[in-house]
Amino acid sequence: MAITSSISRDAKSRSSILSKNVFRAETSSSNRSGRDVQRIQLHDVRRQATAQSLVPCIVDGLKSERRQSPPLLLWNDRGLSLFDAVLDSPDYYPATREWSLLHNAVRKISYSISSGDRLIELGAGNMKKTALILHTLQAQHKHVQYFACDVDRSALRRCIRELQKLFPAKSSNIKIQGLLGTYEDCAAWLKCNKSNSHTSLMWLGNSMANFTPREASEYIRSFLSSGSSMIIALDGCQDQEQIARSYEGQCNREFVLNGLPHANQLLGTNAFDINDWEFVGRWNSKLWMHESFYVARKDLALTVCGETYHFRMGETIRSIRSGKWPKMKVMEICREAGGKVMDSWMNCEETYGVYLVGKH
Ligand SMILES: C[S@@+](CC[C@H](N)C(=O)[O-])C[C@H]1O[C@@H](n2cnc3c(N)ncnc32)[C@H](O)[C@@H]1O
């Protein structure tokens, strides 16, 4: 892969670059086969390298009274492939529910995005749903700058390349770029990259519900403060059996357990032996969230960054959470954030919703 241009890549100047609020952009094209491959404009908006930001989170999580591990450990390139298998598994109802809702409502949802807007997708993933939305915007003759924000460079590049095949830069009204970084990085980038045009943030796949209701409110507050509006897709299913089937099957097990080798890779040691851990899922009724855990198969002593952490057989480390919030709960979360649900599109059973959120 040839990097054809880049704004300063000098690591030493990184802190001064960040302090001037300039984010690195790189433009590259793949020419291995000599074919005309489109360039990818990728902005590295990370304020810290991934290992630098995640290792302290792993340590803090092991030190905390209720042990937890950063959910971001799940989202490396391999994690995204494993998540694709989750999306394809017949028991994973949120994927089919969101697809059919988007299919039915995509034209109406797209009316909330105007020509000239900047559309930023948080946690863009495989961008299959994105393609549906961008096709609709194109059919509505809108010119849109689309930015896919996600955390793994190689997965982001691969998925952008696939999307670019559908929307070639030369002939399409839709211009595609990438933002490499977390949601927080993206919020910081937005603050220093104000645009004259309106910004719409799209958060699909129930991803906002990976945070507690309080954290979700804080994210909304932060994004709305940049003057953006938000399109948020959320699962409101309350059927416990269906949730357990969907989140506790073999595909989910593999997806969650992949966090352990990723932790080892970032720590540079084999602190977590995957054979020592099992996966379990549970419903947390206080938070209206499903929670996934690593469970110690035997008594363990883990050495991480020079400290030893003891686990008795059966003790857990919490991994990812997935909230199941019906409309009333979503409205409450938005209100807490100083926002308001301006419009919403629900499936017939009212178990899945897409919400348009703006400042109150
Ligand atoms: C549940 S998947 C949803 C993917 C896609 N939007 C969809 O609807 O199929 C969550 C996506 O968010 C990304 N992600 C998770 N945590 C993130 C964070 N803190 N900042 C940025 N992206 C994140 C993951 O890499 C993944 O692509």
For the regions a language model picked out, list residue spans one by one.
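Conserved beta-strand signature within the Rossmann-like core of class I S-adenosyl-L-methionine
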Residues: S226-D239
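Conserved class I S-adenosyl-L-methionine
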Residues: G116-G125
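Class I SAM-dependent methyltransferase Rossmann-like catalytic core
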Residues: R66-Y111
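A short, conserved alpha-helix within the catalytic core of class I
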Residues: A209-S226
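Substrate-binding/catalytic lobe of Class I Rossmann-like enzymes that use SAM or dcSAM, i.e.
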Residues: Q242-A337
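Class I SAM-dependent methyltransferase SAM/SAH-binding core
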Residues: T136-D185
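Glycine-rich SAM-binding Motif I of class I
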Residues: M127-A131
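N-terminal auxiliary segments of SAM/dcSAM-dependent transferases
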Residues: A2-L73
